[in-house]
């Protein structure tokens, strides 16, 4: 049986893929994405990296759409990152792997510095936080809106934590959508438009630099009001 999430993503797949490069400061049209998907690496008016990024994102969104495993864990998160980052980063040895303290991340235009710890510590941090979220998402006694809200709080956690050397925003966005699909939460989180990108990045940087529940909930409210499609409404 096709879920509401799968039906929505299936009908909007090309537009979703096109929007997914917005954090790289460009967005193609649905027609351009279709051309890239259909022709792969035949000569096109796009560079190698653009074509590879779009093909990766197309494959990653199909992975989210078709995901049918009985459980989601840290391996799912790493697999999704590998699909998205394959062949488009400057450190291929880190594609699909948590970064360590040897590879610090710098947030452009922000004073915030993501934690740099060993890979083992980073994985343990993820597992602790994600296991708590899974308890909430698996419960029959917690309202759906609370589960959606907590998933978006986890999205902020992933953005702030920057577990990978690159492609963190793309991986975080697809992963939270995979959660929406797997736990049948009847909603979909869009990437922002190019026109609204600066506003979103500004709000995100404010969350980075002012780490508090009020700031995080304000960003969650913004996401719900602007970029979340709720199929139950």
Q: What residue spans do the PLM features occupy?
A:
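FIC/Doc superfamily catalytic core
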Residues: 1-233
């Amino acid at each position: 049986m096709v879920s509401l999430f799968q039906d929505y993503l299936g009908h909007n797949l090309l537009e979703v893929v096109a929007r997914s490069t917005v954090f790289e400061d460009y967005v193609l049209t649905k027609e351009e994405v279709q051309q890239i998907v259909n022709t792969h690496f035949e000569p096109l008016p796009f560079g190698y990296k653009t074509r590879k990024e779009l093909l990766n994102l197309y494959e990653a969104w199909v992975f989210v759409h078709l995901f049918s495993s009985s459980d989601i864990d840290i391996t799912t998160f790493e697999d999704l990152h590998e699909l998205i980052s394959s062949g488009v980063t400057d450190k291929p040895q880190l594609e699909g792997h948590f970064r360590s303290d040897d590879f610090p991340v710098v947030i452009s235009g922000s004073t915030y510095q993501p934690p740099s710890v060993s890979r083992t510590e980073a994985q343990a941090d993820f597992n602790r936080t994600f296991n708590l979220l899974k308890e909430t998402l698996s419960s029959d006694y917690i309202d759906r809106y609370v589960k959606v809200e907590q998933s978006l709080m986890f999205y902020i956690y992933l953005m702030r934590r920057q577990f990978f050397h690159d492609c963190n925003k793309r991986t975080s966005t697809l992963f939270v959508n995979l959660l929406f699909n797997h736990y049948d939460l009847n909603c979909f989180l869009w990437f922002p438009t190019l026109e609204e990108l600066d506003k979103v990045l500004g709000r995100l940087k404010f969350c980075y630099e002012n780490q508090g529940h009020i700031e995080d909930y304000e960003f969650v409210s913004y996401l719900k009001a602007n970029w979340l499609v709720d199929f139950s409404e």
